[in-house]
């Protein structure tokens, strides 16, 4: 997607790395992203992922006149790396519970801060 966007921009291109970081952030703030924790259960994720791939395929085909990405290719890629995802997944809840057991002080602010944060809030109800 990055490469196609750069080509379409012509002399106005920005020099992207072409690794999909920009489109990934667009999905994130557009509240359609797949998050790391979602990768724990690919069967449960499948419906949302189908919608996301369909969304991007419409852009690829209709805006850039490019070939669509087969959904099964995306699922196969995720299945091939699922062990890696599980290896690096850790729960914030477990971390917080540990701090509580250690009697550490924890401060939360939710009304205007953390709960609205795009990374740590009540996604997708974030700003």
Residue ranges and their predicted role:
Residues 1-127:
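Non-transmembrane, aqueous-exposed alpha-helical and coiled segments at domain scale
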């Amino acid at each position: 997607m990055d490469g196609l966007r750069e080509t379409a921009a012509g002399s106005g291109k920005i020099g992207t790395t072409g690794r999909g970081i920009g489109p990934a952030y667009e999905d994130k703030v557009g509240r359609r992203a797949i998050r790391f924790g979602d990768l724990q259960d690919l069967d449960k994720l499948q419906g949302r992922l189908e919608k996301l791939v369909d969304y991007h395929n419409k852009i690829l085909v209709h805006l850039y006149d490019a070939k669509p990405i087969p959904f099964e290719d995306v699922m196969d890629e995720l299945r091939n790396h699922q062990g890696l995802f599980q290896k690096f997944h850790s729960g914030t809840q477990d971390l917080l519970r540990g701090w509580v057991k250690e009697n550490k002080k924890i401060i939360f602010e939710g009304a205007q801060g953390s709960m609205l944060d795009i990374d740590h809030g009540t996604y997708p109800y974030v700003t």
